[in-house]
């Protein structure tokens, strides 16, 4: 079994750019940014429970990273960058810490490296279970209307929230709930030590208005790019800024 993805081919000899979306997104999420890099081959992946991979269920991060590796093999991707937002960034970090063959580097936008104590994990598990129950049982428009009121999305205006609620409500609530629980921060290991000891290139992107993740970025041994005029979802709020940062990263 492999994950559903859309592949766009560029010039031979350059590494692939493998894009991983955030929770409730899909393979289209990164395409405005990715298509600015037409010289590179691009793979836009649907994570389990989402888009064309909605029927794929997983029990945890090991299943997700295993499916991702099988997907790369199926496309004969031998050299690649992982580029992930939020959940996709966490998947990218988890996969990269396993040091797969052919990995050139990782670019993470607003991805959490992991909680650091049992109390934080217990609280996050309670919260994610409550959200998962709502995703399973309530209309998605109502759930996402509340989802985008969370502090991490404070930089969004009302129009941006309405647009996101409409877009995300096309998902399957049950499969979102399953993926939310399987990849909760409550079950993700703290990756800080692994990332500090890494052998791959590691870059971090965060919006200038995303105070939570700017603080987290400061804890990581990563080259951090702050995206102007953007909050947590920087590639949606300022795609040109993310394109500029990614172009700078890929030039090295």
Swiss-Prot record:
Enzyme Commission designation: 4.2.99.20
Coiled-coil stretches noted in the UniProt entry, renumbered to this chain: none
Entry annotated with the keyword Protease: no
Catalytic class of the enzyme: lyase
A matching Pfam family: Abhydrolase_6
Domain of life, per lineage: Bacteria
InterPro entries to which the protein is assigned, alphabetical: AB_hydrolase_1 (IPR000073), AB_hydrolase_fold (IPR029058), SHCHC_synthase_MenH (IPR022485)
Annotated catalysed reactions: 5-enolpyruvoyl-6-hydroxy-2-succinyl-cyclohex-3-ene-1-carboxylate = (1R,6R)-6-hydroxy-2-succinyl-cyclohexa-2,4-diene-1-carboxylate + pyruvate
Pathway where this protein functions: Quinol/quinone metabolism; 1,4-dihydroxy-2-naphthoate biosynthesis; 1,4-dihydroxy-2-naphthoate from chorismate: step 3/7; Quinol/quinone metabolism; menaquinone biosynthesis
Residues in the signal sequence: none
UniProt key word Cytoplasm: no
Record note on quaternary structure: Monomer.
PANTHER family on file: 2-SUCCINYL-5-ENOLPYRUVYL-6-HYDROXY-3-CYCLOHEXENE-1-CARBOXYLATE SYNTHASE (PTHR42916), PROTEIN PHYLLO, CHLOROPLASTIC (PTHR42916:SF1)
NCBIfam families: menH_SHCHC, PRK11126.1
Family the UniProt entry places it in: Belongs to the AB hydrolase superfamily. MenH family.
Protein name (Swiss-Prot/TrEMBL): 2-succinyl-6-hydroxy-2,4-cyclohexadiene-1-carboxylate synthase
Source species of the chain: Escherichia coli O1:K1 / APEC
Highest classification ranks of the organism: Bacteria, Pseudomonadati, Pseudomonadota, Gammaproteobacteria, Enterobacterales
Record gene name: menH
